[in-house]
Amino acid sequence: MHIVFVTTFGQKGGVAKTCTSIHLAAHWANSGRSVVLVDSDRNRSATAYASRGLLPFDVVPMEAAAKATRRADIVVTDGQASSNEEELKNLVEGSDFIVLPTTAQSRSIELTVEMSCMLNKFDIPYAALIVKADARKKASIQIARSILSGLNIQV
Protein backbone atom coordinates (compact mmCIF):
# COMPACT_ATOMS: atom_id res chain seq x y z
CA MET A 1 0.00 0.00 0.00
CA HIS A 2 1.38 3.39 -1.01
CA ILE A 3 0.43 6.29 1.24
CA VAL A 4 0.15 9.69 -0.46
CA PHE A 5 1.52 12.63 1.54
CA VAL A 6 0.13 16.10 0.73
CA THR A 7 1.32 19.21 2.57
CA THR A 8 -0.18 22.69 2.66
CA PHE A 9 2.50 25.27 3.24
CA GLY A 10 3.25 28.95 2.78
CA GLN A 11 5.15 31.92 4.10
CA LYS A 12 2.15 33.99 5.12
CA GLY A 13 -0.26 33.44 7.97
CA GLY A 14 -3.96 33.89 7.39
CA VAL A 15 -4.12 32.49 3.85
CA ALA A 16 -6.32 29.53 4.80
CA LYS A 17 -3.70 26.78 5.03
CA THR A 18 -5.70 25.00 7.74
CA CYS A 19 -8.99 25.50 5.92
CA THR A 20 -7.40 24.15 2.73
CA SER A 21 -6.00 21.13 4.59
CA ILE A 22 -9.38 20.36 6.16
CA HIS A 23 -11.25 20.69 2.86
CA LEU A 24 -8.77 18.47 0.99
CA ALA A 25 -8.89 15.84 3.75
CA ALA A 26 -12.70 15.96 3.89
CA HIS A 27 -12.98 15.60 0.11
CA TRP A 28 -10.81 12.48 0.10
CA ALA A 29 -12.45 11.04 3.24
CA ASN A 30 -15.92 11.56 1.76
CA SER A 31 -14.80 9.73 -1.38
CA GLY A 32 -13.99 6.64 0.68
CA ARG A 33 -10.28 7.13 1.33
CA SER A 34 -8.71 6.67 4.75
CA VAL A 35 -7.31 10.11 5.62
CA VAL A 36 -5.33 11.50 8.53
CA LEU A 37 -4.62 15.21 8.92
CA VAL A 38 -1.35 16.00 10.71
CA ASP A 39 -1.51 19.33 12.52
CA SER A 40 2.00 20.78 12.49
CA ASP A 41 0.91 24.39 12.98
CA ARG A 42 1.84 25.98 16.31
CA ASN A 43 -1.70 27.34 16.64
CA ARG A 44 -3.20 23.81 16.40
CA SER A 45 -6.25 25.17 14.57
CA ALA A 46 -7.01 21.85 12.85
CA THR A 47 -6.94 20.12 16.25
CA ALA A 48 -9.39 22.72 17.57
CA TYR A 49 -11.77 22.08 14.65
CA ALA A 50 -11.48 18.33 15.18
CA SER A 51 -12.39 18.67 18.86
CA ARG A 52 -15.91 19.62 17.74
CA GLY A 53 -16.32 16.08 16.41
CA LEU A 54 -17.57 17.03 12.95
CA LEU A 55 -14.70 15.94 10.72
CA PRO A 56 -14.83 12.63 8.79
CA PHE A 57 -11.13 11.92 9.42
CA ASP A 58 -8.64 11.88 12.29
CA VAL A 59 -6.52 14.90 13.18
CA VAL A 60 -3.30 14.26 15.08
CA PRO A 61 -0.42 16.44 16.26
CA MET A 62 2.92 16.10 14.49
CA GLU A 63 4.30 14.17 17.46
CA ALA A 64 1.73 11.36 16.96
CA ALA A 65 1.94 11.22 13.17
CA ALA A 66 4.18 8.18 12.77
CA LYS A 67 1.79 5.78 14.46
CA ALA A 68 -1.48 7.44 13.46
CA THR A 69 -0.76 7.48 9.73
CA ARG A 70 0.26 3.82 9.27
CA ARG A 71 -3.07 2.71 7.81
CA ALA A 72 -4.00 5.89 5.95
CA ASP A 73 -4.39 6.13 2.19
CA ILE A 74 -3.71 9.87 2.29
CA VAL A 75 -1.92 11.99 4.88
CA VAL A 76 -2.53 15.74 4.73
CA THR A 77 -0.09 17.88 6.71
CA ASP A 78 -1.24 21.33 7.76
CA GLY A 79 2.03 23.27 7.70
CA GLN A 80 2.75 26.44 9.57
CA ALA A 81 3.62 29.79 8.03
CA SER A 82 7.36 29.88 7.49
CA SER A 83 10.03 30.93 5.03
CA ASN A 84 12.73 28.79 6.62
CA GLU A 85 14.42 26.87 3.83
CA GLU A 86 15.56 24.04 6.14
CA GLU A 87 11.98 23.54 7.36
CA LEU A 88 10.77 23.58 3.77
CA LYS A 89 13.38 20.97 2.85
CA ASN A 90 12.13 18.71 5.66
CA LEU A 91 8.51 19.10 4.55
CA VAL A 92 9.43 18.37 0.94
CA GLU A 93 11.29 15.21 1.94
CA GLY A 94 8.14 13.97 3.68
CA SER A 95 5.67 14.96 0.95
CA ASP A 96 4.51 13.75 -2.44
CA PHE A 97 2.76 17.03 -3.31
CA ILE A 98 2.73 20.58 -1.90
CA VAL A 99 -0.30 22.91 -2.00
CA LEU A 100 0.42 26.63 -1.67
CA PRO A 101 -2.76 28.47 -0.65
CA THR A 102 -2.71 32.11 -1.72
CA THR A 103 -5.20 34.94 -1.85
CA ALA A 104 -5.52 37.18 -4.91
CA GLN A 105 -3.84 40.01 -2.99
CA SER A 106 -0.49 41.16 -4.36
CA ARG A 107 1.59 40.41 -1.24
CA SER A 108 0.19 36.90 -0.97
CA ILE A 109 0.98 36.27 -4.64
CA GLU A 110 4.52 37.65 -4.19
CA LEU A 111 5.15 35.27 -1.30
CA THR A 112 3.75 32.35 -3.30
CA VAL A 113 6.12 33.18 -6.15
CA GLU A 114 9.03 33.30 -3.65
CA MET A 115 7.96 29.93 -2.24
CA SER A 116 7.74 28.54 -5.77
CA CYS A 117 11.34 29.62 -6.40
CA MET A 118 12.41 27.76 -3.26
CA LEU A 119 10.40 24.66 -4.23
CA ASN A 120 11.95 24.63 -7.69
CA LYS A 121 15.23 23.63 -6.01
CA PHE A 122 13.61 20.34 -5.03
CA ASP A 123 12.10 17.60 -7.15
CA ILE A 124 8.54 17.95 -5.81
CA PRO A 125 5.28 18.65 -7.63
CA TYR A 126 3.31 21.59 -6.25
CA ALA A 127 0.49 23.94 -7.13
CA ALA A 128 -0.90 27.24 -5.94
CA LEU A 129 -4.53 27.34 -4.83
CA ILE A 130 -6.31 30.69 -4.90
CA VAL A 131 -8.37 30.89 -1.71
CA LYS A 132 -10.72 33.40 -0.10
CA ALA A 133 -11.81 34.32 -3.61
CA ASP A 134 -14.66 36.82 -3.75
CA ALA A 135 -16.87 35.85 -6.71
CA ARG A 136 -17.81 39.52 -7.11
CA LYS A 137 -14.16 40.33 -7.87
CA LYS A 138 -13.57 37.96 -10.76
CA ALA A 139 -11.01 40.28 -12.37
CA SER A 140 -8.63 40.06 -9.39
CA ILE A 141 -8.91 36.27 -9.39
CA GLN A 142 -8.16 36.16 -13.13
CA ILE A 143 -5.18 38.49 -12.70
CA ALA A 144 -3.80 36.34 -9.88
CA ARG A 145 -4.25 33.19 -11.96
CA SER A 146 -2.62 34.87 -14.96
CA ILE A 147 0.40 36.05 -12.95
CA LEU A 148 0.96 32.64 -11.37
CA SER A 149 0.41 30.72 -14.60
CA GLY A 150 2.66 33.15 -16.46
CA LEU A 151 5.45 32.21 -14.06
CA ASN A 152 4.85 28.50 -14.74
CA ILE A 153 3.19 27.93 -11.38
CA GLN A 154 0.39 25.38 -11.65
CA VAL A 155 -2.87 26.86 -10.34
Briefly describe each language-model feature range:
Residues 2-15, 22-93, 146:
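P-loop/Walker-type NTP enzyme "switch/lid" segment
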Residues 15-16, 136:
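Short amphipathic alpha-helical "recognition" segments used for binding
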Residues 20, 33, 58, 107-110, ...:
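Short linear functional motifs in flexible/disordered or boundary regions
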Residues 74-155:
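Conserved catalytic-core segment of NTP-binding enzymes
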